[in-house]
Design a protein with these regions (language model features):
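Conserved ATP-binding subdomain of kinase catalytic cores across diverse folds
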Residues: 1-150, 164-166
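Activation-loop N-terminal segment of eukaryotic-like protein kinases
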Residues: 160-162
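Hydrophobic residue at the +6 position relative to the catalytic HRD Asp in the kinase catalytic loop
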Residues: 156-158
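C-terminal catalytic region of ATP-dependent kinase domains
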Residues: 1-27, 164-385
Length: 385
């Protein structure tokens, strides 16, 4: 009976209210912004469908969604993505210096609390002879992300579109190294400035005691059968249906340039390195000029960027416990599960307090800063430090 699970009842009620509020907000924004969408993205016709659930939830249940119109579909994101346009301006400036430097950033219409992006569909290469060009462009993209302090660009954040790898989420750009009194700033700086921080490159998988062993990088992450252990439904379509521990496939994403994913990457390392080197050297020379420095300042000053204190998987593992029936009976039990977050002794305890507050709403915690201030604030607008 539902009375046995008062926490579940509360969660359903709150989730329904948040969903209703978010849905009304989306429709209101669409009504106000549609003329701009018609002009900038060429939208025509009526809205036929909305697909929710693309990505994690933040900001009290808000998530990325796809809007389907008569002749097109676009991505709606409940956040300010002016950073896309700023980075695109810089990328286009560099391309004018050398036309072989191509970086595609989705066209974006950004508002203070929401944005629209063009939908980038997966377009695998028909001929493998184009792979050298693809991996040259991947090297260019890696250098771009690295030089602008990008991180957490895993396989879900990159779409292969012909000979172009296209990143579809730039909110983790312009990251700053975090300070930890116990670890030491020198070690953290060394780790931060490694190119592997971007997650675009293979990291030999994630090997943990729970059996997870998959490659998450945007370069190589693809389908793997029986990749890890987890809860699976068995005895489907019977009265004995239940969850049990079993093997789960890792589905991969749309990040590989060929559909079958069978690529001997070693053949293209030379192209990859050349792309990285070409962009790096061009950027190095441009950065000696006052014009380019002014361009960077004009486009990067005052941008809202995300701050990462933990990887998303760490939060997701805690949330998975909160979904267990045992944690739907007493709210105190949920608080005990959230206590695990305090095991990481951040020097600023306000970080963990905010993480707990956001995860009580079953959101992935999120924090922000602006490029012109030395402060961090959370999704509720609370200043953390």
């Amino acid at each position: 009976p539902i009375n046995k699970y008062p926490v579940l009842l509360r969660q359903i009620s709150e989730s329904c209210l948040r969903f209703y509020t978010y849905f009304i907000e989306i429709l209101s924004n669409l009504e106000n912004d549609f003329s701009v969408l018609e002009e900038e993205l060429g939208l025509r016709g009526k809205l036929n469908d909305i697909k929710f659930g693309k990505g994690d939830t933040h900001s009290q249940g808000k998530t990325v969604l796809i809007l389907f119109f008569d002749d097109a579909k676009i991505v709606y994101k409940p956040k300010n993505l002016i950073i896309n346009n700023s980075l695109n301006t810089i990328a286009e400036y560099i391309r004018k210096v050398d036309e072989k430097i191509r970086i595609r950033i989705p066209r974006t219409i950004a508002y203070s609390d929401h944005s629209y992006e063009e939908f980038i569909d997966y377009l695998p290469l028909e001929q493998k002879k184009k792979l050298p060009e693809y991996y040259y462009n991947f090297g260019v993209l890696l250098a771009f992300i690295y030089l602008f302090n990008g991180s957490d660009i895993h396989f879900e954040n990159l779409i292969s579109y012909g000979d172009m790898p296209v990143i579809i989420d730039f909110e983790t750009m312009l990251q700053q190294p975090l300070f930890d009194d116990k670890t030491g700033q020198s070690l953290l700086d060394t780790l931060f400035h490694r190119v592997t921080r971007t997650l675009l490159l293979p990291t030999e998988g994630v090997k943990r005691e729970d059996g997870l062993d998959v490659e998450m990088s945007a370069l190589t992450g693809n389908f793997k059968k029986d990749a890890f252990n987890g809860q699976v439904l068995i005895n489907l379509n019977t009265d004995k249906v239940k969850f049990d521990i079993g093997k789960i496939d890792f589905e991969g994403g749309k990040n590989l340039p060929v559909r079958d994913g069978d690529i001997e990457f070693d053949k293209y390392i030379k192209d990859f390195k050349k792309g990285f080197r070409d962009f790096y050297l061009i950027f190095e020379e441009l950065n000696k000029t006052e014009e380019f420095k002014m361009l960077l300042k004009a486009n990067l000053y005052g941008l809202k960027t995300r701050v990462l204190f933990r990887d998303t998987n760490s939060y997701a593992s805690v949330l998975s416990f909160l979904y267990h029936p045992d944690f739907y009976e007493e709210m105190l039990d949920r608080e005990k599960a959230l206590e695990n977050l305090w095991s990481n002794k951040f020097s600023n305890q306000g970080i963990v307090a905010s993480e707990c507050e956001q995860m009580r709403l079953l959101d992935i915690p999120i924090f922000y800063t602006d490029t012109n201030i030395n402060e961090i604030y959370d999704d509720f607008g609370n200043h953390i430090g």
